[in-house]
Amino acid sequence: MSTTVRPDEVSSILRKQLAGFESEAEVYDVGTVLQVGDGIARVYGLLKAAAGELLEFPHNIMGMVLNLEEDNVGAVMFGASNAVKEGDTVRRTGILASIPVGEAMLGRVINPLGEPIDGKGAIETSIRLPLERRAPGVIYRKSVHEPLQTGLKAIDAMIPIGRGQRELIIGDRQTGKTAVALDTIINQKGKGVYCIYVAIGLKGSTVAQVVNTLEKHGAMEYTTVISATASDPAPLQFIAPFAGAALGEYFRDTGRHALVIYDDLSKQAVAYRQLSLLLRRPPGREAYPGDVFFLHSRLLERAAKITDDIEVAKKMNDLPEALKPMVKGGGSLTALPVIETQAGDVSAYIPTNVISITDGQIFLESNLFNSGQRPAINVGISVSRVGGAAQIKAMKKVAGTLRLDLAQFRELEAFSKFGSDLDKTTKAQLDRGARLVEILKQGQYIPMPVEKQVAIIFLGTQGLLDAVAVDHIRKFEEDFLAMLELKHPEILKSIEEKGSLEPDTANGLKEAAAKFIITFNEKAKA
């Protein structure tokens, strides 16, 4: 047997081997941690990093680029920074911070990175949208004209909210801000509005309570809760509202209606201040960074009512590629930001900023809350700048004088404390005002359909309730509405379907009320 080596055979074998060789090498842009602590890392070597880009730290901790400096990058970390040390390798991902979106997110509790935290398993969705996105331009918008009913008489009558509006809920702690927001979510049942509740810096127990309340009222079916609690790192609290806006934009741009609640933005501003100071950005008023106004304006401007023209909507600025095939016109994103004040001071920095950005505010007062008026809305300084155009005709008609009547009542009430001898007209006005205040009181988590609101407010403003004792008004309201549903459903149906209070419907309502008041008063005396 010949043992001679044949060079041509060897070279052909080598050629075959080389032809089948595949390079498995992957190229990563990596940097080195120079300094780390308090959730902030300074990284050297990431020359091509982009602002808002995600970084991968050791131990699967994600971070995000916030500062681009001459010789290093300032990054915030979404996990425990004590697991990372000086000299560790950091990898660029090339992806801007984004969140998974889709119908699969409904009914779930997630963190601001889109990861489920409710123990119900993974979320199956293929679309991701960037957290930061420019607001739709003027040409892609439509003026607010459809109502978003909160189910709260005081708001729907005097401070109406329209789809695509930004309405601020502002007040001291423990005045019912979250309750107003939750009532609004519960009232969207069956109305085709998808809700996103963003909890920023709240206690974990409070978030659990919110989820429990929504589940109890069947509202989690159309709601997503995004939670960044007080124990979560400041960077997560900072990006949480942007995650909520991105999820809301998915529904808005696919021709549907969404409602996002930011509870609350004052805590997001505090988290942003913390990050900015640690990144050595220059402080401004109340130590907030100079761009804290831009932080909130760029977030809240993303709430909009989109034009009905699909062809125009498809050309919307900054539209992510993943959404382009699904775009439809006529969608909306309504924002209800919450701001907490200190001792009723609405002239502080963050409250004045957000008041100037939004289309109106609902101001809740602790004095009213403690006196038993709930929701504790101060009608005097609460306003809706664009919601009037979205209010249904029936409500506009019956509640037209309500704000003025209440303002006069408050003035006369203060005046009447000084003197006991009041003339008949003043006394009548005070009695009417007391009944109107009583009408606007409402229990928690029992939002009322708009047709029932119209019916009861109509009785109050027309003076039909003057014959009912003030302390019996709440009971009368309950019994009267139950009677209407049972014996005169056509009245409520007419208001609901036509959206206006026709003369024959108004007369029918007056007659039904007059008869019912007599029997009600007889029962009350017995």
Curated annotation (Swiss-Prot):
Membrane protein topology class: Peripheral membrane protein
Enzyme Commission number, as recorded: 7.1.2.2
Keywords: ATP synthesis, ATP-binding, Cell inner membrane, Cell membrane, CF(1), Hydrogen ion transport, Ion transport, Membrane, Nucleotide-binding, Translocase, Transport
Gene3D superfamilies referenced in this protein's UniProt entry, alphabetically: 2.40.30.20, ATP synthase alpha/beta chain, C-terminal domain (1.20.150.20), P-loop containing nucleotide triphosphate hydrolases (3.40.50.300)
Binding site for ATP: G171, D172, R173, Q174, T175, G176, K177, T178
Reaction(s) catalysed by this chain's protein: ATP + H2O + 4 H(+)(in) = ADP + phosphate + 5 H(+)(out)
GO cellular component: plasma membrane; proton-transporting ATP synthase complex
Site (Required for activity): S382
Subcellular location: Cell inner membrane
Tagged with keyword Signal: no
Superkingdom assignment: Bacteria
CDD domains: ATP-synt_F1_alpha_C (cd18113), ATP-synt_F1_alpha_N (cd18116), F1-ATPase_alpha_CD (cd01132)
Database matches in InterPro entries: ATP_synth_asu-like_sf (IPR023366), ATP_synth_asu_C (IPR000793), ATP_synth_asu_C_sf (IPR038376), ATP_synth_F1_a_nt-bd_dom (IPR033732), ATP_synth_F1_asu (IPR005294), ATPase_a/bsu_AS (IPR020003), ATPase_F1/V1/A1_a/bsu_N (IPR004100), ATPase_F1/V1/A1_a/bsu_N_sf (IPR036121)
Keyword Lipid metabolism: no
GO molecular function, one term: ADP binding
A Pfam family assignment: ATP-synt_ab_N
Assigned protein family: Belongs to the ATPase alpha/beta chains family.
Subunit structure: F-type ATPases have 2 components, CF(1) - the catalytic core - and CF(0) - the membrane proton channel. CF(1) has five subunits: alpha(3), beta(3), gamma(1), delta(1), epsilon(1). CF(0) has four main subunits: a(1), b(1), b'(1) and c(9-12).
Function: Produces ATP from ADP in the presence of a proton gradient across the membrane. The alpha chain is a regulatory subunit.
Protein name: ATP synthase subunit alpha
Gene that produces this protein: atpA
